[in-house]
Design a protein with these regions (language model features):
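N-terminal helical cap/lid subdomain that shapes the substrate entry/recognition surface
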Residues: 1-68, 72-73, 77, 93
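Asp-based, Mg2+/Mn2+-dependent phosphohydrolase catalytic module
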Residues: 6, 72-75, 79, 88-89, ...
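Glycine- and other small-residue-rich loops at beta-strand/loop junctions that grip anionic moieties
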Residues: 59, 84, 159
């Protein structure tokens, strides 16, 4: 996103986009001030650039260290996995590129048209497609929105600190558990 903004002449810090991404507030309000005369045009330019730049950015995305062994172990134990993201379909490209897509039974992106998190609709549809009841599921995420959506859907929730949300933001949502990194899932559920 910072690269997109730079292309239209606006330079922002990483922190400027983390809070809106974590909380669901409008990112445009944070990064393109209302005082800019051609604000609507700048937003339009960004919307055109995002798919082009993201396509290149996602080519360089690498999985978190230790992710594949975790996915392998979960698969061995019969755990059904799904992905629900507010991002575009291109955001799951790294799962294909690194041959991790095979571990996920369901992949849902914003193009499916469900209300954004914290609404539970996407979580519930993901569970429906996997034929899992909410009380048998765990929503794992790195933002307060993920935790709220999981709770609203009736699942247990796990906050992961290796992503966007801060420890304070995740703790404020009172998830079932908080872990430092995805690889901690195995010890959390005694699957080591």
């Amino acid at each position: 996103f910072r690269e997109v903004m730079a292309k239209i002449g606006i330079h922002i810090k990483r922190e400027d986009i983390l809070e809106p991404m974590a909380t669901g507030s409008l990112i445009w309000d944070r990064v393109i001030p209302a005082s800019i005369a051609d604000r609507d045009e700048k937003i339009r330019q960004c919307m055109e650039l995002i798919p082009q730049i993201y396509k290149e950015v996602f080519k360089s995305v690498r999985p978190f260290p230790g992710l594949e062994p975790v996915l392998m172990r979960l698969e061995e134990k019969g755990v059904c996995l799904g992905v629900l993201t507010a991002s575009r379909t291109i955001a799951v490209q790294p799962l294909h590129h690194h041959s991790l897509i095979r571990y996920f039974r369901v992949i849902m992106t914003r193009e499916e048209g469900f209300p954004n998190k914290p609404a539970p609709d996407g979580v519930l549809e993901c569970l429906k497609r996997m034929e899992i009841l909410p009380n048998q599921a765990i929503t794992i995420g790195d933002t307060p929105l993920d935790i709220r959506a999981g709770k609203a859907a009736g699942t247990l929730t796990v906050g992961v600190l290796s992503g966007i949300g801060s420890s304070a933001q995740l703790q404020a949502e009172e998830p079932t558990a908080i872990i430092e990194r995805v690889s901690d899932l195995l010890s959390l559920f005694d699957l080591e």
